[in-house]
Regions:
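Amphipathic, Lys/Arg-enriched alpha-helical "gate/interface" segment within cytosolic domains
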Residues: 1-132
Length: 132
């Protein structure tokens, strides 16, 4: 069952070491901090074996520069906590894809990332390419 706070929701893909988050509309820094801590609390049991993260951004509004900075911090924390790959479901939004790519680059973590139209495509990629 998904945990929710404002525009953010977080859940685990059953039977997989994958955390899925989804955003709808406009978010803010407080919601993003909640999101980060919620994902970290779920994923802590997989730190040594590794886990993957899917961000469903397809229904989100673009983020502000300050919120983008919070997402960079989130990326660093997730990688430190054992996250092996980030998959982004961005629908048809080029702007969301560019923002996600820039935030990952700014994190300087070198984490594997993929960009897709749907969550299903992201899951298929994680199964076939990342093997978590």
């Amino acid at each position: 069952m998904a945990k929710k706070n404002g525009a953010q929701s977080v859940e685990v893909i059953p039977g997989r070491k994958i955390v899925l988050s989804a955003g709808v509309g406009k978010t803010n820094i407080e919601e993003l901090k909640w999101h980060t801590e919620t994902v970290l609390s779920i994923a802590k049991m997989w730190k040594t074996s590794g886990w993957d993260y899917i961000a469903d951004c397809s229904q989100m509004s673009p983020v502000s520069p300050a919120e983008g900075g919070e997402l960079v911090t989130m990326t660093k924390k997730f990688v430190e906590a054992g996250c092996k790959a980030f998959a982004f479901a961005e629908g048809s939004s080029v702007l969301l894809k560019v923002q996600a790519q820039k935030n990952t680059q700014r994190s300087q973590t070198g984490v594997v990332e993929g960009h897709f139209a749907t969550v299903e495509e992201a899951l298929d990629w994680l199964k076939s390419e990342v093997h978590i």
